[in-house]
Amino acid sequence: VSLSKSKSNTNAHSSLVTDHAESEVSLSAVEKDANHMLIQASIQDSATSDEVDFVHDAVLLPETVAAVLGVKSLPTQAEGNDQNCLNMSGIYVDATFGRGGHSRLLLSQLADDAKLIVFDKDPTAISVAQELASKDSRVHVVHDSFATLTTSLAALGITQVDGLMADLGISSPQIDDGSRGFSFMRDGAVDMRMDTSRGQSVAEWLEYVDEETLANVLYEFGEERHSRRIARAIKQMESYDSTLALAEVIKVAHPNWQRGKHPATQSFQAMRIFINNELGDVDDFLAQSIPLLKVGGQLAVISFHSLEDRRIKQFLQRHSKGQYPEDENLPMPPKRPRYFSKPKRVGPSKTETSRNPRARSAWLRMATRTDSDYVIDDAP
């Protein structure tokens, strides 16, 4: 049963390893971390004290900014050196502002006439973004999902951009704040909405959803093999007002625990993804990147789990090869445009994962927009 809420439409450094339609970039820990401390210090100078923890944890930070700017690497950072800026003009989008780690580093490489449009669903993230915008006229803030990319940019008079970047998934502050409902380690209301100002919470949804639909959600969005057993236990709960109580019920119902992984991990992921329509939004975002990016424009997307990463990989393969799976059995397959160059992939170094364990599952995929004209019928 497909439960997606919206229609799902299915450069870097050296040492490339070919993987189907992508090139995987392998970077040494020494190369990736040579400038890390100075980069982080520079960003933290522009962040308020309560944002520093998140800024420090921004994943694949210089790699993502270099990718969205279309350069191999950022200039060497040096204290007191003002010549470490690329001074690039253009219009760029940070589709997932968070606490602004990637945005701040990107701004440090942009010219005075450049523009940076930042999106986020989270009201707290938007407050941080608005504070940044009040200090930097290049920043424009959109409080909405990146699925609204085209219409939101059009409202600002923008039809095409030079670069798009997104850091998918949940942020550290959201996990660490028990009141948001994302954590099974801290108690709070069973909410899980990225945007607490709109939509229904997971608790409200659990009150009326039937057991079969819940099981399908756990299986489809959490890849939970024991979804039916867990769904049955959840529906037997008297109330849904505590994340710790919900996690305990899942823990008791789960027959097999993977060592080092909480048994509620996949179920919490599934409910969060479903209630926020995360995969549908990713599909919509990727589809809109084709007409929005200028020729030579850069797409850079970080994902943290296989459901997201698989979508990004398949999208870039499809539109870099010009080969659609549905065309394979046709006697005369149509000639499809190749909208992107051969994709590349970057993972975190061992140094980064030791410093920030949440980076372990991260993958950055990137590609360059070709000069193929956009054809509406070829939309994903």
Predicted regions and their residues:
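S-adenosyl-L-methionine-dependent methyltransferase catalytic core, i.e., the SAM/SAH-binding region
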Residues: 1-380
